[in-house]
């Protein structure tokens, strides 16, 4: 769908975030921490954060996600100086109605609720009423001689609470209005000057609970570019996380209950991490890494999604165009391997899942090796999908301008190459390296294009099937130290080593690796036989490619290329 995230590393990040929220719901500690989404620009942090908020909005509109709050009513009937405009007052912090009960009664009610719900976590609530609600409760209890039931029956209405970012209700996205002059009232609320003349400055009714933490109560606080805030301003987050309280101006501490999410990029993270004065803040954050995609086919899916959502006329994207653009992106994000037996492109292919049983490539070891070289992990640096997506868009417009109805890999490569140095986020000292990576991608594309031509010209299903069966007959005889029947004479003979090697050499398998490959395909055939499936070389990518290349070598001298042109 349109809200899909691509790539193993991104799904690991999402899984980690969900686990932290779940453990927080069980009171295991993460509820007292900021969930800090850390990643390079364009890695999907903001999109993920936005989708969390949209999901929460949707969830509170469903039966299983129902939330309730309360409002005070008929206040002017009891409180003489109550402003008629404030006869009905909604809970300014959208608190749960259960906080209206004294703790002993509340605990009994919550115990009954937990038994009925049979939820995988236990509901708890030890919060105090916010100052304004506490004021109303005290006044009303005094009027009714401490009869709480009369207060609840005559002055409380229970209302549904729907999370709504546009209304700043149970969801708040925070970005300071002025990054040079940040005011804590943006977080915790401020005096309502229009009410001071009515109630007086120290009256809790004259306070405006419109701070970001107030609006986010019972929901999600999302801090945009959180670590760009001034150090002093971030101190407000210390109590908001560890103690789950806020301290507005001229007010006592107020209890809050919300998931606090922050987003930041690498430069700000390094700056704050190295600041000794930020030690307390850093201790209250749980970092969740949001790196770039490291599988080039998953990267290509991002570009396909972009094109699918664009207002474009029918334009044919040639084979390998988006995959090779994705490969370039991945090459800029991964570390050069230490193994002499594997190069950077092969490592990218391994990360893409293009390895076989006989390949001497340990993907887990490659990841661990890279982790020792970089500060956090692979994918935290490199070219962003935004840059590549922009260049694909430019290449499309260039093709349309030239009256071409297709987008080719070569046009895309040219746009990437011509605009590398114009992109502000790419360090100058990486230009030459990235140009080299583009050349590697061009070579990879050339090999794939040649392979496509071979496949098209040598494509003969019957012959590939026949050659595949012959290869497997000789392989099984080789493994079992047996003989095979000669196709012409019918006599038993030794396996044809020359024929076997003529197939295997098309995959550039050295002599010392042939046994591994033969055992691999033999295991594959045996596994399919047990599952009741017939042998078809088309279902084994490496065997198919080897047979196609051999067939190409056998037939290419008989192809009339002039006639094809």
Where are these regions (language model features)?
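Conserved ASCE/P-loop NTPase catalytic core
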Residues: 1-565
